[in-house]
Amino acid sequence: SPGPDRLERWHAKWASKQTRWHLQQEHPLLVRYRADLFGPQPRHDSPSAKATRSNVLFPLCGASVDLAALALRGYRVVGVEGVEAAVDALLETFGDEVEQAPPSVSGSLRLRTAVAPGEAGSDAPAVLRAVEGDFLHLSPSAADALGLPRFDAAFDRGALVAVLPEDREAYVATLAGLMAPEGRVLLVTVEHDGFAGPPYEVREADVRELFSPAFAVRPLQREDRMGAEPHWRERGCTRFEEAAYLLTRHRAG
């Protein structure tokens, strides 16, 4: 489906401030599985810390607080978001946006950057970058044109489950094209009945079918969320589970 149609409902949700999916603190699964996603990390104040920090991708990021949390720890964070109001909120909350001269654009995609004071004891500012535009347009060549790296890590919470089912294969192909060999993705999905979506149900069989050609798939956990999030019952659910997977990009060839 074309980009404007894909993004129209999300523009409407932001315009009416229907953003209940945002958490006010770092996502618990990102905290729990940080070592699985990034591998062992040096102390933040060690000389090698900055050099070994990962390039981290957040597809369909909205204004999630997770991006700022990692950027402030020295990770090189890039979010991708199709709703301008969401990118505005993300960067304004983080720090001061830096005007790009000339603007960094590739087709309908625009790279925006904000800076904030870095970690205590560090002279280097924290940097958060966001690509404003349709994630499915972020091909490897577009990423190169914007000066983006291939990513060592990515966090997908609320991205795949928000994508229309007919766009899932294109989403996975786009994500795979942006990941470095052996890059890791922490993927959070939901399984439920009662309504179609979003968030759409993505079962383990779906995850394996979608990702196995390009990634090794390792299930991490599954949790019943009906007790903690009773509003799903109001939407007709008799079950609502959250599942997490670690995906590791195959080596090229």
List where the protein language model places each region:
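Class I (Rossmann-like) S-adenosyl-L-methionine-dependent methyltransferase catalytic domain
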Residues: 2-48, 54, 63-67, 73, ...
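Generic beta-sheet signal
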Residues: 54-56, 152
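Class I SAM-dependent methyltransferase "Motif I" SAM/SAH-binding loop
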Residues: 57-62, 159
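A short SAM/SAH-binding and catalytic strip from SAM-dependent methyltransferases
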Residues: 136, 151-167
